[in-house]
């Protein structure tokens, strides 16, 4: 919901051309207006009405199998050994198996969130705050919002894959998965993957991003 609110903020800001005093004053009122909508449940209702557009999410889950992660960052565990061997298999999925995998991962994320993040939401929230502050604030066209939401979806998919076979997920594993993903983001492989992801993006980056939040 927090990422959806950021997207709404960017969408409304993009529809306010110019930077005169009146426009800037209206922009400064948007965060409080969104907070008020959240308190009243309006924002949640709008979020629940987002239509599911699973194609992009399915493609991203498959694409994750081609990422060159530095698995050595992870603390020792059986999953550290088994998951890297399973990742390349993601690239072999056809359309039908992509759809099944995406459904499994979505269900698994709900379970994983409740077990590991619901009582400690700061772990994901701190990462999101860092990314929004460094990559999104100051942008009004959604160009940097779409990569952020893609990264959120990829990171949650990676975590869901970790727990998909019933493997335990320690807090140290979570921190290491975040670190491993951030190291990948700074790699040459990430630049190539970004180009592939952009080719999957629809004309409107905000709508593409919203499709990953459903």
Description of each model-found segment:
Residues 2-214:
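Hydrophobic, aromatic-lined core segments that form the binding pocket/scaffold
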């Amino acid at each position: 919901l927090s990422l959806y609110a950021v997207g709404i903020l960017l969408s409304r800001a993009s529809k306010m051309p110019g930077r005169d005093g009146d426009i800037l004053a209206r922009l400064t009122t948007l965060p409080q207006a969104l907070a008020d909508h959240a308190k009243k449940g309006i924002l949640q209702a709008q979020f629940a009405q987002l239509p599911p557009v699973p194609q992009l999410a399915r493609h991203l889950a498959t694409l994750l199998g081609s990422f060159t992660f530095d698995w050595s960052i992870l603390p020792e565990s059986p999953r550290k050994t088994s998951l890297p061997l399973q990742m390349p298999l993601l690239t072999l999925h056809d359309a039908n198996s992509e759809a099944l995998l995406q459904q499994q991962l979505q269900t698994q994320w709900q379970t994983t969130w409740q077990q590991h993040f619901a009582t400690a939401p700061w772990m994901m929230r701190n990462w999101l705050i860092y990314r929004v502050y460094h990559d999104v604030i100051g942008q009004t066209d959604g160009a940097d919002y779409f990569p952020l939401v893609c990264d959120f979806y990829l990171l949650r998919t990676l975590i869901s894959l970790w727990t998909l076979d019933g493997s335990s997920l320690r807090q140290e594993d979570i921190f290491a998965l975040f670190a491993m993903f951030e190291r990948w983001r700074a790699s040459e492989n990430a630049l190539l993957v970004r180009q592939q992801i952009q080719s999957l993006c629809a004309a409107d980056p905000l709508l593409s991003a919203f499709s990953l939040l459903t």
